[in-house]
Amino acid sequence: MLQKVKLEDMIQSGMHFGHSTREWNPRMAPYIYGERNGRHILDLVQTYYLLNKVLAFLEEQAAQGKTFLFVGTKQQAAPLIAKTALACESFYVNQRWLGGMLTNWRTIQKSLRKLQEYRRAEERGDWNLLKKQEVARKRREKDRLEKYLSGVENMSRLPGVVILIGQTEEIHAVKECRQLGIPTVTLLDSNCDPNLADWFLPANDDSVSALRLILAWFQQAIQTGQLRSLEREAAKKQKIKKTGVKISGNRRTSSITKKRNPASSKI
């Protein structure tokens, strides 16, 4: 069950502080409460309402067995992104977004296979037979691939949902998701465009306290949905075990095969 979201916690985390009034996007006007000392203040009542919708969406997607990709390359967000994604068995990009990460996924998969080959060669001691310069080159390439791709190393197909911590910094990821029709959940500060997000949350995307709180809620919603999915699968298996009937779509197939009557085959 999801932990109750409290408005007080949102205020204490500084979730309501936006950017300078000079940097705002007019499309965020409906989600801005006002301004203070030259800085926009986000309307946390709107944020609270939208947060509950986002959490319900994440839980339902997880219950349907969808996979999630967390994207956040800001320095203050990077460690939180990795921790949250790993906690809910999801994937992440917390360094630089490589162009074509999603739209050219086959090429990315080739890079991942190359990374695995480098690791196996190093473990076998193959590099001991090479010149020092060649070993240094391969190790640099391996380190580069690990830095940028380690969070998607086990992602065998495109994600079901992409969660973007910040929009302006992750605009290339946003464009790729829109091109492929992958639903997005995006944190939007006062300088962002809500028209580029499927599901969004108006919030301070620079505050570590706010990010930690939001990601904890996201994690909990996904884990709750994943638990529902596991429970449903367990119930299906139990039903098959008891009845011997497997339900597939609208058809019911029995796992019990009737013995053929030998007499029926006689002429």
Curated annotation (Swiss-Prot):
GO terms for biological process: translation. Belongs to the universal ribosomal protein uS2 family. GO terms for cellular component: chloroplast; mitochondrial small ribosomal subunit. Residues 237-267 are annotated as: Disordered. The gene is rps2. PROSITE patterns: RIBOSOMAL_S2_2. HAMAP family: Ribosomal_uS2_B. This is Small ribosomal subunit protein uS2c. Keywords: Chloroplast, Plastid, Ribonucleoprotein, Ribosomal protein. Residues 250-267 have a biased composition (Polar residues). GO terms for molecular function: structural constituent of ribosome. It is found in: Plastid, Chloroplast. InterPro entries: Ribosomal_uS2, Ribosomal_uS2_bac/mit/plastid, Ribosomal_uS2_CS, Ribosomal_uS2_flav_dom_sf.
